[in-house]
């Protein structure tokens, strides 16, 4: 069922690419999530929407009706009580009839096709509910309620957008609903990032406190070492200054003689350079005129190529924009599919945990029953022995045995006395 919904969402983007022109400016949701570390977020620019033509409105409304039908089928597929299923089927039939009456501009052929498709989809949904696998019947009532609420909310948003599109040719209600969902998600991410920042800041402050203590100790030690080092440097500097003074005097004399020789040589080279430059300027003037003529011809050719490439650029940008819109729609549908799979996995994990808990309870109960049975057997054996020993009830020992036992007891007493 999820794959069918993805195909339905992707189909209108391919049909409406060349005709629907919608411009939405502002920061996308991914960029907003990446900028959560900043304290202030940039304000998004307002959305600009152009009204759609009548043909586009009919196409988009047909697609939205198909989506609403798919959502109603999803409601029939979800395992609920039989009474609720009947009420949902009646509600879906009323919604389908109302939507058909609100679109009088459609042709009769489209209406008959949609009615037949709705009847087939309802029949498929009913058959699927009676042939559900056992895994779906294990879902809890809370998850079913959440799925039903999400499905109802999504169908209401699409229905409102379809009514608005049929009335005014725009879909601002759909954009407002998306904005609300985006704001709630952004607030949740803000709370998480603030908490993480607070924890990181506490850790950094603790580390900084330890670093400051270590730095202070190192600074005191380095200061003492630096004072001793400066004393040594002072003595070395005194000796170096005396040597440098002698060296600077000799070096100044040598530099003066060398600069005089260099100046004479440079003067000769400059005169030769002036003559060469004069020859080059004459040649460059001649080359400049030739290059100017050549560049004018090339300019004309480049202007022609520029016009050609500008037209090609406009066409390519339009094609790439259409591809980008298609990719965005595919990305949104894939994200919805992944979210559904994640929900299903969480539900299966909950079922497995409950099964393990139930098995553990049964094992403990069997052990308790076995222990009670053993204790009962021991108690019965003890009772029977005590009944026989104490002659309770019909159990009595023979008299000879009693006399013998008395004689034996008397003999034992006499032996003890003798000892």
Curated annotation (Swiss-Prot):
Disruption phenotype: No obvious phenotype, except complete male sterility. Female fertility is not altered. One of its GO terms (cellular component) is sperm flagellum. Residues 394-413 have a biased composition (Basic and acidic residues). Residues 372-401 form the IQ domain. Expressed in the testes (at protein level). Also detected in oviduct (at protein level). Also detected in the trachea. It comes from the Eukaryota. Residues 25-45, 394-419 are annotated as: Disordered. Keywords: Calmodulin-binding, Cell projection, Cilium, Cytoplasm, Cytoskeleton, Differentiation, Flagellum, Spermatogenesis. Residues 30-45 have a biased composition (Acidic residues). It is found in: Cytoplasm; Cell projection, Cilium, Flagellum; Cell projection, Cilium; Cytoplasm, Cytoskeleton. Component of the nexin-dynein regulatory complex (N-DRC), a key regulator of ciliary/flagellar motility which maintains the alignment and integrity of the distal axoneme and regulates microtubule sliding in motile axonemes. Binds calmodulin when cellular Ca(2+) levels are low and thereby contributes to the regulation of calcium and calmodulin-dependent protein kinase IV (CAMK4) activity; contributes to the regulation of CAMK4 signaling cascades. Required for normal axoneme assembly in sperm flagella, normal sperm tail formation and for male fertility. Early spermiogenesis defective 12d (esgd12d) is caused by mutations disrupting this gene. Affected male mice display complete loss of fertility; their sperm cells lack tails and are nonmotile. Component of the nexin-dynein regulatory complex (N-DRC). Interacts (via IQ domain) with CALM when calcium levels are low. Does not interact with CALM in the presence of Ca(2+). Interacts with the HSP70 proteins HSPA1L and HSPA8. May form a complex with CAMK4 and HSP70. Belongs to the DRC9 family. The IQ domain mediates interaction with calmodulin when cellular Ca(2+) levels are low. This is Dynein regulatory complex protein 9. It comes from Mus musculus.
